[in-house]
């Protein structure tokens, strides 16, 4: 394949950043098409006659499918390449969003059958969304040099938070005018657009992209560690990822952080409408502000992690943003749960999500550093545990709310944030699985 020429020995092309842009757009669309259910919750629950605990089962279905297919998603991304896998799953996002809109109502199905139908569809939605971040992880490790992963990972995570912000405004507005079914139908084509764009422009390896010049290729490869680009033929190589102590501690820490994340993902909009008694459209704008704050936190966390890794090394450079982010999010979550003034509580919860997302880039950079050439699998293990915690959240939060009230349900996340700090202190990002 003809390589793009470089006009200057020091002037590299910027194809890697265009690849990152499409990845960020993919994470944006993925989050629009997975958070839509949370923002449709009050309307759907009323229309379909579901209680909070029954709705928790529906939410758990997504995270069950997402968790089960995380590790296989990492394996698929490493084996078949990010280009094929992301294209296929993006088509799946679109199709299953359409299917969600077709779930029958109370006039056709009993409550049990409605829950079963929603559970089945949302399980499949979780399954096809599961590979996105392991695949993104594997793509970034191919396209960016060692020591420069946290910033692109943080920027890619910014796409997901902006997707949540967009859905928080768009979904309630469309529902107010046309109903929840039309909202799902209108969003479905976004998945097809991502599939087309990614297949057309991306390549699994920088060397295979005709627009990458020699200078950019040398920049990407110049700082790789020995062995990073060598593919292992050992059949049991994947088992080392599952058995590695640092990967397991990282999974437990990231899982703890994600309990707080799932309070936002699953329940924040519902909490604003049903507990704090905001109008749905107002709650949408507040939720959007929270997701935008998360986007800023994700971008800052990635940049900060790269800077700290350069000064302190991988071990503490990846730890410090997580320690600060988790401690601050725990404190702000308690303020949001216990303060009686809605404006103060909401402000604290918005800031809580900023600090929660400060951790995203550092966590994924750690998974890449620890995973080495098995970065996709390491990311899959980490995110599998995180989404098992999503199932716990979907079932535990409404149970706590029913028995102890919503204050206790929201505040429970602070304990998990503290656990996340303790587990992260046991992770060493400066040693790999190999």
Predicted regions and their residues:
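Residue-level signature of mid-helix packing/kink "hotspots" within the transmembrane helices
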Residues: 35, 63-71, 130, 164-165, ...
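Extracytoplasmic gate region of multi-pass secondary transporters
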Residues: 37-38, 243-299, 357-360, 364
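C-terminal ends and interior cores of transmembrane alpha-helices
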Residues: 91-111, 327-340
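Hydrophobic core of transmembrane alpha-helices in multi-pass small-molecule transporters
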Residues: 96, 109-131, 332, 343-358
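Cytoplasmic helix-loop-helix junction between adjacent transmembrane helices
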Residues: 121-160
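Helix-loop-helix hairpin linking two adjacent transmembrane segments in secondary transporters
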Residues: 156, 160-209
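A late C-terminal transmembrane helix in Major Facilitator Superfamily
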Residues: 298, 368-403
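C-terminal transmembrane helical hairpin of 12-TM major facilitator-type secondary transporters
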Residues: 315-362
């Amino acid at each position: 394949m003809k390589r793009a020429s470089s006009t200057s020995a020091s002037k590299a092309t910027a194809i890697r950043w265009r690849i990152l842009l499409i990845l960020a757009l993919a994470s944006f669309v993925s989050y629009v098409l997975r958070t839509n259910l949370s923002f449709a919750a009050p309307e759907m629950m009323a229309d379909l006659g579901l209680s909070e605990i029954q709705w928790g089962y529906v939410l758990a279905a997504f995270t069950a499918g997402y968790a089960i297919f995380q590790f296989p998603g990492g394996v698929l991304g490493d084996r078949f390449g990010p280009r094929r896998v992301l294209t296929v799953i993006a088509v799946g996002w679109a199709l299953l969003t359409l299917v969600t809109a077709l779930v029958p109502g109370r006039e056709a199905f009993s409550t049990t059958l409605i829950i079963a139908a929603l559970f089945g569809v949302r399980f499949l939605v979780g399954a096809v969304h599961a590979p996105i971040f392991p695949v993104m992880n594997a793509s970034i490790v191919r396209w960016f040099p060692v020591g420069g992963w946290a910033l692109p990972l943080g920027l890619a995570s910014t796409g997901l938070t902006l997707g949540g912000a967009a859905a928080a405004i768009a979904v309630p507005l469309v529902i107010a005018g046309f109903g929840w079914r039309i909202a799902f139908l209108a969003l479905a084509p976004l998945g097809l657009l991502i599939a087309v764009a990614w297949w057309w422009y991306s390549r699994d390896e920088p060397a295979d992209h005709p627009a990458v010049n020699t200078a950019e290729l040398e920049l990407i490869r110049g700082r790789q560690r020995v062995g990073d680009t060598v593919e292992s033929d050992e059949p049991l190589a994947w088992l080392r990822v599952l058995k590695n102590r640092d990967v397991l501690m990282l999974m437990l820490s990231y899982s703890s952080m994600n309990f707080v994340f799932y309070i936002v993902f699953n329940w924040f909009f519902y909490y604003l409408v049903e507990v704090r008694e905001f109008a749905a459209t107002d709650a949408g704008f507040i939720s959007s502000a929270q997701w935008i704050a998360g986007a800023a936190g994700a971008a800052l966390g990635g940049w900060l992690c790269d800077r700290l890794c350069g000064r302190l090394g991988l071990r503490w450079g990846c730890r410090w943003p997580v320690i600060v982010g988790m401690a601050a999010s725990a404190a702000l979550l308690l303020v949001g749960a216990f303060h009686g003034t809605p404006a103060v509580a909401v402000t604290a919860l918005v800031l809580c999500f900023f600090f929660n997302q400060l951790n995203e880039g550092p966590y994924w950079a750690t998974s890449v550093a620890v995973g080495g050439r098995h970065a996709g699998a390491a990311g899959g293990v980490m995110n599998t545990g995180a989404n098992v915690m999503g199932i716990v959240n979907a079932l535990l939060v409404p149970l706590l709310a029913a028995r102890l009230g919503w204050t206790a349900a929201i505040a429970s996340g602070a304990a998990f944030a503290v656990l996340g700090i303790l587990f992260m202190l046991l992770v060493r990002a400066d040693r790999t699985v190999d």
